[in-house]
Amino acid sequence: MTTKSYILGFGSHAPERILTNTDMEAFVDTTDEWITTRTGIKQRHIAAEGETTSDLGAKAALQALANAGLHADALTHILVATCTPDAMCPSTACLIEHKLGVSGLMALDLNAACSGFLYALNMAQGIVALTPDAKVLVVAAEVLSRRINWNDRSTCVLFGDGAGAVIVGSHPNEGRAVEVADSLLSSDGALGDLLLISGGGTSVPYKHGQPVGDEFFVRMEGREIFKHAVRSMARVCEELLERNGIAREDVDMLLPHQANLRIIEAVGKKLGIPADKVFVNLQEYGNTSAASVPLALADADSKNLLPPGRTVLLTTFGGGFTWGAVLLRT
């Protein structure tokens, strides 16, 4: 019999500083109306100088631990999904481990861009299946504000900083069981150049004494991203529902990657899921990449939107291309 995996606690953290659309009018050629009508975003959180991805991730982790009624010394593994790590080495996971005051855990980072949290959640499922006593901290955290060209209106209005976290284990908390029932993940590396940060790696290294170019910031082909994101998320959701014998009308909540309201609405429409069943909070946070889904999950949990008996469908799409869906049962 396969060991089941459950989310034991939810946590999130966003930086204190808020940058509104109106604030952005002062330094980029845009307006609140232009941003809102095209993206649905009203504001985003921006990390303070010196505030790092591991800082945000550790705070989200502490909240998830408190929500689960656990101390950090109960953890056995730490998985961190990020494309904006503190450093190339050591891993952000090891830095979070240290900030939680523990050591001796298996700790690693993974990069699947905006799909990172779902990839990490799938890995946590596998760990729990192999080690039923494991308690896995899954963190997704990003400081994208330092990888944005703030003169590029097509990208700088979209992204924000934040972190989300969950604790995964085989024994549900008394009175609350959020089962990670199934997942389906995919990728297509042939399309990687449509959404990327190429600078800083071995293909486009930093060269001493030379100015940092656009290669070190997020670059994307918006129209192509929209088309592929909607098609990929809708298709993977359909496949996951069919595999589990679930009709679309039996989905109680669709919680998609909070990238752009137009994409979210198009995915919901393609799946035939009414808007009142689609969770949206990007108006408050913008696109936080890998952090968007766990941040939204923690938000939904805090609003008591995950009561017993719910079928919840998570889906995401990101650079790579990567995409996927996860089925939760409460």
Curated annotation (Swiss-Prot):
EC class: transferase
Biological pathway: Lipid metabolism; fatty acid biosynthesis
InterPro entries per record: ACP_syn_III_C (IPR013747), ACP_syn_III_N (IPR013751), FabH (IPR004655), Thiolase-like (IPR016039)
Record-level GO cellular component terms: cytoplasm
Keyword field: Acyltransferase, Cytoplasm, Fatty acid biosynthesis, Fatty acid metabolism, Lipid biosynthesis, Lipid metabolism, Multifunctional enzyme, Transferase
Localization terms from the record: Cytoplasm
Record GO biological process: fatty acid biosynthetic process; secondary metabolite biosynthetic process
Active site: 114, 257, 287
Main location: cytoplasm
Gene Ontology molecular function: any one: beta-ketoacyl-acyl-carrier-protein synthase III activity
Catalytic reactions of this protein: malonyl-[ACP] + acetyl-CoA + H(+) = 3-oxobutanoyl-[ACP] + CO2 + CoA
EC code: 2.3.1.180
Top-rank taxon, per record: Bacteria
ACP-binding as annotated region, ranges: 258-262
Pfam families: ACP_syn_III, ACP_syn_III_C
HAMAP family: FabH
Family according to the record: Belongs to the thiolase-like superfamily. FabH family.
Function according to Swiss-Prot or TrEMBL: Catalyzes the condensation reaction of fatty acid synthesis by the addition to an acyl acceptor of two carbons from malonyl-ACP. Catalyzes the first condensation reaction which initiates fatty acid synthesis and may therefore play a role in governing the total rate of fatty acid production. Possesses both acetoacetyl-ACP synthase and acetyl transacylase activities. Its substrate specificity determines the biosynthesis of branched-chain and/or straight-chain of fatty acids.
Domain note: The last Arg residue of the ACP-binding site is essential for the weak association between ACP/AcpP and FabH.
Subunit structure: Homodimer.
NCBIfam families: fabH, PRK09352.1
Protein name as it appears in the record: Beta-ketoacyl-[acyl-carrier-protein] synthase III
Organism: Oleidesulfovibrio alaskensis (strain ATCC BAA-1058 / DSM 17464 / G20) (Desulfovibrio alaskensis)
Gene: fabH
